[in-house]
A protein has these predicted regions:
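Glycine-rich helix-loop "coupling/hinge" segments at transmembrane-helix boundaries
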Residues: 5-42, 51
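Charged, flexible cofactor/metal-binding loops and thiol motifs
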Residues: 45, 103-107, 120, 252, ...
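The feature captures the beta-strand-to-loop junction immediately N-terminal to the Walker
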Residues: 147-148
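P-loop NTP-binding/switch modules centered on Walker-like glycine-rich loops
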Residues: 163, 288, 292-375
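Conserved ABC transporter NBD signature motif
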Residues: 170-181
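A short, proline-enriched helix->beta-strand linker immediately N-terminal to the Walker B motif
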Residues: 277-281
Length: 418
């Protein structure tokens, strides 16, 4: 509202908005300013200016108050409601699959991970259980795929590893990375680890770049974050080496270009190069091939496989496309409703799926040549379960054609083949 008021005032002051005899903020200020000689004798002529300032500030304060009331976690200043909600953390002890020695020796182990979002609207508080007891581990140099529909908890699980969850997310469980317990780190400690040891790339890479910064400046800022003593020439040399490694042509010339001058596939290559700039050991690729055509998808997948072979890089690859994941990954985790439905090697998941949800995902994947037939594409009936009100037992049971009575019991067990 203040923006509309100021726009109308500016236009009317310039004579492009509301004109006499109608009255507006801009026309009043224009009249008063035009009689500047009288301001000394009649200072009250500036009254419309002060009233305009008071009205716009009042609307701003009202908007801030409403935001703090309906969404306390995103308030600028701490509120009593935010402090009260931060104390509401449930415990889920669960069963430990790994000993403490195994946790500390492993490359990455996620043990009994729960992520709950507290969303407050007015006096109503809703708890959304996005992840409900996820457990998995991976070795150095392994590529782990996570597949599932939107809302399955894939991205939230991996965002907890990188420490990028919002303030209204409560994380429980244990995450060990190279002997370091990530769930016990402060935000400052996470910043030291993020980028240097854990890198992330996301879908729609164009949104990850500042449109006003050249790619060369982005690389310089990233490199100096870990090595402040680097000179401009050294940063440029390192950036060219990284861009050549990810297969971007004319790397040195293109450092002067801005994000809008690159295609989606080229920007994703640049994102991967930036993730490697500080020497990360684990790369989290959250749907990096979304919105890219099939040819570019294959190139990105091939690039990730090459980086694993050359650098010994460990990769978590998230996607909806189970066939694409199987072509790249060593092991696959199938998630739905915040739980792991099934996990195994790529060959086991593709050739011998055991859970009905995995079978449904495979059946709904378009096959080569199917567009030449009149047969309709298979789809999974129903909707994804609501994380705000999870069902007991297997979350896929309401949509499953093979549902049994035991599927709706509390003790859900995922299918493990590794």
């Amino acid at each position: 509202i203040p923006g509309f008021i100021m726009s109308e005032t500016t236009l009317s002051y310039l004579g492009l908005g509301i004109n006499d005899p109608a009255v507006s903020w801009g026309s009043l200020i224009n009249r008063d300013i035009s009689t500047l000689n009288n301001l000394k004798n009649f200072p009250w002529l500036l009254t419309p200016v002060w009233l305009l300032l008071a009205v716009t500030l009042a609307f701003n304060f009202l908007g801030d108050a409403l935001r703090d009331f309906y969404d306390p976690f995103h308030s600028v200043f701490p509120t009593w409601k935010k402090r009260r909600l931060e104390k509401k953390i449930k415990t889920h002890p669960g069963q430990c699959e790994f000993s403490m020695a195994e946790l500390q020796r492993s490359f990455l182990t996620v043990q009994n991970l729960f992520v709950t979002f507290d969303i407050t609207t007015g006096n109503k508080n809703i708890q959304i259980q996005a992840v409900r007891g996820v457990t998995f581990s991976m070795k150095r140099g392994e590529i782990l795929g996570i597949v599932g529909e939107s809302g399955s908890g894939k991205s939230v699980s991996t965002t907890a590893i990188s420490g990028l969850l919002p303030g209204n997310a409560f994380v429980e469980g244990r995450i060990f990375f190279k002997g370091i317990e990530l769930t016990s780190l402060s935000q400052d400690q996470f910043r030291e680890l993020r980028g240097r040891k854990i890198g992330c790339i996301f879908q729609e890479p164009g949104r990850s770049f500042d449109p006003l910064q050249s790619i060369g400046n982005v690389f310089a800022e990233t490199l100096k974050n870990s090595e402040p003593e680097l000179s401009k020439e050294e940063c440029k040399k390192r950036a060219v080496e990284l861009l050549n490694e990810v297969g971007l042509p004319d790397a040195e010339k293109r450092l002067k270009n801005f994000p809008h001058q690159f295609s989606g596939g080229q920007l994703q290559r640049i994102s991967i190069a930036l993730s490697l700039a500080q020497g990360c050991d684990l790369l989290i690729a959250d749907e990096p091939t979304t919105a890219l055509d099939v040819t570019i998808q294959a190139q990105i997948v091939e690039l990730l496989a090459d980086l694993r072979n050359k650098r010994g890089l460990s990769i978590i690859f998230i996607s909806h496309n189970i066939d694409l994941v199987a072509s790249l990954c060593d092991n696959i985790i199938v998630m739905y409703g915040g739980l792991i439905m099934e996990k195994g090697t790529s060959a086991q998941i593709i050739k011998n799926p055991r859970h009905p949800y995995t079978k449904a995902l495979l059946a709904s994947t378009p096959k080569f040549g199917s567009h030449y037939t009149e047969q309709e594409l298979s789809s999974i009936p129903g909707r994804v379960t609501d994380p705000a009100s999870p069902v007991p037992g297997c979350p896929f049971a309401p949509r499953c054609g093979f549902k049994k009575d035991e599927c709706e019991k509390e003790n859900f067990r995922c299918y493990k083949m590794i």
